[in-house]
A protein has these predicted regions:
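Classical eukaryotic N-terminal signal peptides for Sec-dependent ER targeting/secretion
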Residues: 1-31
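M14 metallocarboxypeptidase catalytic domain recognition
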Residues: 20-351
Length: 351
C-alpha cells in the first residue's frame, strides 16, 4: 500500500478527520474564515451602473432616474399609475426576443409592504440583469413593478423605517392613522381572515376593495392581461419561503395546488443550490391566513403559476435584523430569486 493512493486515504482516515484536514487546508489558503464554527456572512460589494449602485438602497426619485437610464430597444419604462401622494408607480417591460413564437407574459411586483426594502432591490437587479441577458426563454414578455408602494417606501426612508402600509388619508379625523395594507386590499375574499377593520392596524384592509391606487393599478393590469399572463410573483420579506395560494383561510386550495407545490419545490431547490439558505415551499395560510392578498387575487383570475416569495431569514451574521436587511445580502438574494424565476419561466414555456 502507498499513501499516495486515494482509496487508501479514504480507508485510513475517517470522514470526520478528512473534513478537518480539508478545512485546515482551506484556512491555510485563506479561502474561508471560521467564526464560531460558521463561514462569515457575505460582504458588501458595489455594483454600479450609471452612478446607481444596484447593491444598495435608494430613494424613489433615484430609482425612477435609473430605470429611465437603462431603457433600450428591448426595455421600456412607463408609469402604471400614481400613488395617493402622486408618486409614479413604474412598470418595466422587457420584451420577448423571439416574436415568431407565441408570447408568454410573466409579472413580478415588489415593495407592496414599504419596509421590505430587499424586495425592491431584488426587483431592480432583476430588471437590469435580465434586460441584458438571453439565458431565459426568448418568447417571454417580462413585466416588473419594482416599487408598488412608493409613498410608504419614502416614508420608511425619512420618518419611520418600520412603516408597512400606504400613506393615504382615509378621513380628516383619521390623520393620525394613515394608510392601508395594500396587500389586504384586493377584491378576493376581501376583509376576511388575517385582516382588520381598525384603520390604525398594520393589517387594515381599507374602507373598500381597491381603495388604494397602489393595489388598484396592479389589479387592473392583471385583469386586463389575465389570458396572456402565465406567471405572477410577488416579492416580500422575510421568511425564506415560497408561498403557494390560497392564503385567505386554512385548507383553501386551488384545483392545481399539487402542481403549484411541486413547481415551488423545484424553485426552492434552485435557490438552495446557491448558498444553502434552506428556502421552503409552503401553503400561504400555513405562514398565517391573510385575505385580500394580491397572489390570491391573481390566482382567482386564472393565472396559472402564482407565488409570493418571502425573501431572507431576517438574520445576518447570526443577528436578528428583521425587515432591515443589510445591503450585504442584496446580491445573494437576487441570485436566489433569479434562479427560482428562471426555473419557473423555463417550466412555463415547455408546457
Amino acid at each position: 500500500m502507498t499513501l499516495r493512493d486515494d482509496s487508501v486515504l479514504v480507508n485510513i482516515f475517517r470522514p470526520s478527520l478528512l473534513a478537518l484536514i480539508k478545512k485546515a487546508m482551506l484556512l491555510w489558503l485563506g479561502l474561508i474564515t471560521v467564526v464560531a464554527g460558521f463561514a462569515p456572512p457575505p460582504s458588501y460589494r458595489p455594483f454600479v451602473v450609471n452612478n446607481f449602485d444596484l447593491n444598495d438602497y435608494h430613494p424613489h426619485n433615484n430609482i425612477l432616474k435609473f430605470l429611465n437610464s437603462i431603457q433600450n430597444n428591448r426595455t421600456r419604462v412607463r408609469s402604471l399609475g400614481v400613488s395617493s401622494e402622486r408618486r409614479h408607480i413604474p412598470i418595466v417591460k422587457i420584451s420577448a426576443l423571439d416574436e415568431t413564437k407565441p408570447p408568454v407574459d410573466v409579472f413580478v411586483d415588489a415593495g407592496f409592504h414599504a419596509r421590505e426594502w430587499i424586495s425592491i432591490a431584488t426587483a431592480l437587479n432583476l430588471i437590469y440583469n435580465l434586460s441584458r441577458s438571453n439565458d431565459w426563454p426568448s418568447n417571454i414578455n417580462l413585466y416588473i413593478v419594482p416599487v408598488a408602494n412608493p409613498d410608504g417606501y419614502e416614508y420608511t426612508r425619512t420618518v419611520d423605517r418600520d412603516w408597512r402600509n400606504t400613506r393615504s388619508i382615509l378621513a380628516p379625523n383619521l390623520k393620525s392613522c394613515r394608510g392601508v395594507d395594500a396587500n389586504r386590499n384586493f377584491p378576493f375574499h376581501w376583509a376576511g381572515q388575517g385582516t382588520s377593520n381598525d384603520p390604525c392596524s398594520e393589517i387594515y384592509h381599507g374602507p373598500r376593495p381597491l381603495s388604494e391606487p397602489e393595489a388598484r393599478v396592479v389589479a387592473q393590469f392583471l385583469s386586463k392581461r389575465a389570458n396572456s399572463l402565465k406567471v405572477y410573483v410577488s416579492l416580500h420579506s422575510y421568511h425564506n419561503a415560497i408561498l403557494v395560494p390560497y392564503g385567505y383561510r386554512y385548507n383553501a386550495r386551488p384545483r392545481d395546488y399539487n402542481e403549484l407545490m411541486w413547481t415551488a419545490l423545484e424553485m426552492t431547490q434552485a435557490m438552495n443550490s446557491l448558498y444553502g439558505n434552506n428556502y421552503t415551499a409552503i401553503n400561504s395560510a400555513q405562514l398565517y391566513p391573510a385575505a385580500g392578498c394580491s397572489d390570491d387575487y391573481a390566482k382567482s383570475l386564472g393565472i396559472k403559476y402564482v407565488y409570493t416569495m418571502e425573501l431572507t431569514t431576517g438574520e445576518y451574521g447570526g443577528q436578528y435584523v428583521g425587515f432591515e436587511t443589510p445591503r450585504e445580502l442584496i446580491q445573494q438574494t437576487y441570485d436566489e430569486v433569479r434562479a427560482a424565476l428562471l426555473t419557473l419561466m423555463w417550466k412555463t414555456v415547455q408546457e
